[in-house]
Amino acid sequence: MLIGFSVVSFGQMSNKKPVEKTVSLGLKGGVNVPRMLYFQNEALSQLPQAFTVTPTGGLFVDIPVGEAVVLAPEVMYVQRGTDMSYEHRSGAQVHYTMLASYVDLRLPLEFRCPVSNYFQPFLVIGAEGGMRLFGQIHMDRTEPIAMDETIDVGDANLALIHAGALAGVGVRSRVNIGASYILLKLSVTAHQGLLDSYAQGEKDGTSAPLNVNAYQITGYRLPQGLEACLSIGIPLKAGQDDACATFSKDRYHRHSNRGHLFGF
């Protein structure tokens, strides 16, 4: 994908134009690899977590705020959770999964390296805040204490609000189409939650969700993610400058032809 993206980008270099400081609006989509960081809980932090790929997508706005800086706020759908297997002290084999859907508001800042107008690597850092929508927790285990149960996530077993930070790298390009262009961005970002995702009810004992039966809740459970996304945007003022330039040239040619026709 990156090779194809680069070929399209460099193909545009033969028709260079000044970089327009134009706001763009578009769609962003890709995949996310969610997991959990168990902090101050040595037992859980040592358990392996399965590699899980989930879809993610949303809307973004690309707002240039300087020669090499872009503010790119976005609203995204993303899934967070974990998938782990371990052996209980009783000898039972336990499989525990949690996958919850969120809607995020993110405020990334992109710092571009202007290699050319049509191929610009960038670094991105930013903040994100999200709200839990829905999801499920599933646990199954073998004898001698066999069980297989699935419950919905809620206030009793998963915090409602998510807040975190993100950082990553990417490349951006402009693909000219007539008098306008399409903005393309390919990015890979790491996401780190900063708020504990354990619900207060399950930590203070006022609720007894499936989590309590799976393990002793201590420390903090912080969501993490690794996203790879493609963004496609269109300018909100497409081709206005080119239209003015074309109108001016047309007037010049008409006046020039009239002068030759009438001799002045």
Regions found by a protein language model. Give the residues of each.
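Transmembrane beta-strands of outer-membrane beta-barrel proteins
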Residues: V23-G29, L71-P73, V103-L105, P121-G129, ...
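Acidic/histidine-enriched, beta-strand-rich ligand/metal-binding domains
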Residues: V69, M76-T82, A100, R112-F122, ...
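Outer-membrane beta-barrel strand-turn architecture
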Residues: V19, V33, I63-E67, F111-N117, ...
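Predominantly the C-terminal beta-signal and adjacent terminal strand-loop region
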Residues: Q120, N157-H162, A167, R172-F264
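Short glycine/proline- and aromatic-enriched beta-strand/turn motifs that initiate or cap beta-hairpins
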Residues: F10-G58, G233-G239, G259-F264
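Extracellular/periplasm-exposed beta-strand and loop segments of Gram-negative cell-envelope proteins
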Residues: R35-T52, Q79-Y102, G130-H162, D196-T206, ...
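Short, well-ordered amphipathic alpha-helices
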Residues: G11-Q12, L59, R106-R112, L166-S173, ...
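Hydrophobic h-region of N-terminal signal peptides that target proteins for export
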Residues: L2-F10
